[in-house]
Amino acid sequence: MSLSLSPGLYTQAARLPRELLTVCSITIATRSFSVLHRPTPNYPGHVPLTSIERSGLAVGSAIMAFFNPYRADLIAACGEATATPYFIYRLRDAMLSSPTGRRILRDRPRISSKTLSMQHLRTLPTNAVGRCYADWLDREGVSPDTRDSVKYIDDEECAYVMQRYRECHDFYHAITGLPIVREGEVALKAFEFANTLLPMTGLSMFAVMSLKPAERRRFFTIYAPWALTNGLKADELINVYWEEQLERSVEELREELGIEKPLDLREIRRAEKERKKAQKAT
């Protein structure tokens, strides 16, 4: 039987990632092609998924992201596919239980180079939250504009919660000082898992298996204990209105949130590199 898709349905299908289209094609023999019966989106950019599609997206994106952890789109898809039905609602409820969290849900602020003046942040005192954020972005060579838009979470409010978590991720890097090297990302994901309970952050810790032996030892002896201890005892970071904290002292904010700054990973890696270089020279 041949299928004739309207241009609108072709557009819907084109928005689906390759892994999800594979899942759709596998199920075509047992039921009608799901794109033909896709529900109406709940918000701009929303792609509704069936349970089979969501499971396929979760498994496919998790496996592919393990082998290529720099594919932010795969990590984002895995995060959305595994956040429902429970975990993203728990995070939303944590915001609803906090006066600041409720304000964030009401105001719906977004974090990007359009909403934050990077030029102004670079003029703040060196210990200000905004200056630490801008300096971290400059040092790591990243931009606040690289976060994908949420599209696989059905509830519109929960979709914003996931978007907010995603856009705040670099602030977590900035206040902890962890770099975006794989070792630093694994440490931060462990911290986020203890603080948010989002499954994707926990799954990301499997990337520790891809680290070098010395890096794995550092993770298990230094950064995993720090991440789990601080993630559990710290306040819910999803409730931090970062836009209102930019001129505060980063040390003061860390103390208020209950976060101890970890050992400087870049300095540890630099010292290790220098030690190896000295050994080769002798």
Curated annotation (Swiss-Prot):
Give GO terms for biological process: ubiquinone biosynthetic process
Q: Answer yes or no on keyword Metal-binding.
A: yes
Q: Which cofactor does it need?
A: Zn(2+)
Pathway, per record: Cofactor biosynthesis; ubiquinone biosynthesis
Predominantly, its location class is: mitochondrion
Say which enzyme class the record assigns: lyase
Compartments where located: Mitochondrion inner membrane
Alphabetical UniProt keywords = Lyase, Membrane, Metal-binding, Mitochondrion, Mitochondrion inner membrane, Ubiquinone biosynthesis, Zinc
Documented EC number(s):
4.1.1.130
Q: Name one GO cellular component term.
A: mitochondrion
Q: Which residues bind Zn(2+)?
A: 169-170, 173, 185
Query: What's the catalysed reaction?
Result: a 4-hydroxy-3-methoxy-5-(all-trans-polyprenyl)benzoate + H(+) = a 2-methoxy-6-(all-trans-polyprenyl)phenol + CO2
Q: How does it sit in the membrane?
A: Peripheral membrane protein
Which InterPro entries does the record cross-reference, listed alphabetically?
A: Coq4, Coq4_euk
Q: What does this protein do?
A: Lyase that catalyzes the C1-decarboxylation of 4-hydroxy-3-methoxy-5-(all-trans-polyprenyl)benzoic acid into 2-methoxy-6-(all-trans-polyprenyl)phenol during ubiquinone biosynthesis.
Q: What else is known?
A: This protein may be expected to contain an N-terminal transit peptide but none has been predicted.
> What family does this belong to?
Belongs to the COQ4 family.
Subunit composition?
Component of a multi-subunit COQ enzyme complex, composed of at least coq3, coq4, coq5, coq6, coq7 and coq9.
Q: What is this protein called?
A: Ubiquinone biosynthesis protein coq4, mitochondrial
User: What species is this protein from?
Assistant: Sclerotinia sclerotiorum (strain ATCC 18683 / 1980 / Ss-1) (White mold)
Lineage summary: Eukaryota, Fungi, Dikarya, Ascomycota, Pezizomycotina
